[in-house]
């Protein structure tokens, strides 16, 4: 989500479809939730039961419930509880934290079943709901999503039955970085660049 890249693509790749990968735009939403968590829990005037457990399991607040550990845990009290129930029990102690948790879970649910033809209306609704939130972190997220909305919606376009993704490009970048790590072994850069092209062509043939 960088305007410099978008400007370059528009200037040089006129027929390209610009799409922002879900990983990148969802990162803004999850960071907003975690920022709310940090702000709320830093208030020394508030007491939170099970705070120490949440401090080591904070990622669960912004994890899709379907990816939670599929097992039960036993508390010191002898009570058996699921991971989701323990997280939800914790966030219920603060209205803003509970709202943030439920909001991100609702968005996970909506996006998981969203199709391209409904993407525009769905994102308009989500952005409006974030913008009207009393949490400043969600308001900032809504501004960012609104700015890049066209490219976020494009991520739902399918090509060969797969959504547009920067996964293949990230894979190439990873290979280039690995080759750069051993670049000192080459006497000139021409051999290095030829090696990159060779590796990429071998991968294409598999």
Tell where the protein language model's regions lie, with residue ranges.
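Inter-helix linker motif
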Residues: 17-31
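Short, surface-exposed linear patches
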Residues: 18-21, 40-43, 189-190
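Short, surface-exposed amphipathic charged segments that create phosphate/polyanion-binding patches used
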Residues: 30-42
């Amino acid at each position: 989500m960088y305007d410099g890249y978008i400007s370059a693509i528009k200037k040089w790749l006129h027929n390209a479809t610009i799409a922002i990968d879900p990983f990148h735009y969802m990162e803004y939403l999850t960071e907003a939730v975690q920022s709310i968590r940090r702000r709320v829990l830093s208030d020394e005037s508030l007491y939170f039961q099970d705070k120490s457990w949440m401090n080591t399991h904070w990622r669960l607040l912004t994890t899709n419930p379907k990816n939670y550990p599929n097992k039960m845990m036993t508390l010191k009290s002898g009570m058996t509880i699921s991971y989701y129930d323990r997280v939800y029990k914790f966030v219920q102690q603060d209205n803003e934290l509970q709202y943030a948790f439920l909001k991100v879970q609702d968005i996970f649910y909506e996006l998981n079943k969203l199709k391209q033809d409904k993407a525009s209306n769905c994102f308009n609704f989500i952005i409006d709901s974030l913008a009207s939130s009393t949490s400043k972190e969600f308001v900032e997220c809504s501004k960012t999503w609104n700015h890049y909305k066209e490219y976020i919606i494009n991520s739902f376009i399918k090509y060969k039955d797969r959504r547009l993704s920067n996964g293949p490009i990230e894979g190439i970048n990873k290979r280039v970085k690995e080759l750069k790590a051993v670049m000192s072994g080459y006497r000139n850069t021409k051999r290095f660049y030829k090696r990159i092209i060779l590796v990429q062509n071998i991968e294409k043939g598999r």
